[in-house]
């Protein structure tokens, strides 16, 4: 009996460190056919560099869309049904939120898991090679090195809008995931970082600020049409 309990505990532990495998299954109450908008967003990545998942609160934007796709690209562990963009080797990526606190409590949590239990988020535990703490922000991570199935490594850096546009200058990126709406100047700066790599821009947010320039651009609405 003790051996059986140990086996069950180990199985549970391994499943917790492969959270990504539980999303969008073929069948069951959470089968992927129930999420047509999510799948449409993923497919669009094969043709479009810039995408926005604009939706209400509490429908899985951050975890089921942003964190899920970002983790796939970082690891190269695409499911068989994936019809979106694929990267065949390690990448450089940013994930950014409104401020350091929300970045830690949302993006870091969704991708890595709880403090002291990294590997229980969307990035599989055995794919996380190294994490670097963020100076001056308790329990926050600045960067993560991730194993890619091609045999090399990906690197993810957590950033926040309150660092200002200048902090988004410099290095080229393959993926930039912006969770919550940023200012237009930050968006343009991030888009510039992906140009030489033909990289992807992902945005996930609820339009709490109304019909902003960014929302209008994605919806194809001109100011005269408002």
Go through the PLM ranges and name each one.
Residues 1-226:
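Phosphate/NTP-binding elements of NTP-utilizing enzymes
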């Amino acid at each position: 009996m003790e051996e059986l309990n140990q086996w069950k505990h180990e199985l549970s532990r391994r499943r917790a460190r492969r959270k990504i495998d539980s999303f969008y299954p073929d069948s069951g109450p959470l089968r992927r056919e129930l999420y047509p908008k999510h799948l449409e967003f993923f497919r669009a990545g094969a043709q479009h560099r810039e995408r926005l998942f604009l939706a209400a609160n509490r429908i899985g934007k951050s975890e089921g869309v942003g964190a899920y796709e970002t983790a796939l690209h970082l690891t190269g562990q695409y499911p068989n049904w994936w019809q979106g963009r694929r990267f065949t080797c390690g990448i450089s990526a940013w994930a950014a939120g409104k401020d350091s606190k929300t970045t830690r409590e949302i993006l870091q949590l969704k991708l890595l898991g709880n403090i002291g239990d990294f590997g229980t988020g969307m990035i599989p535990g055995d794919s996380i090679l190294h994490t670097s703490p963020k100076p001056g922000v308790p329990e926050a991570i600045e960067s993560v090195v991730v194993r890619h199935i091609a045999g090399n490594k990906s690197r993810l850096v957590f950033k926040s809008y309150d660092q200002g546009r200048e902090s988004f200058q410099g290095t080229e990126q393959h993926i930039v995931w912006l969770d919550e709406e940023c200012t237009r100047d930050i968006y343009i700066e991030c888009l510039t970082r992906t140009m030489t790599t033909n990289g992807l821009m992902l945005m996930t947010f609820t339009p709490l600020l109304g019909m902003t320039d960014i929302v209008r651009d994605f919806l194809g609405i001109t100011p005269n049409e408002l």
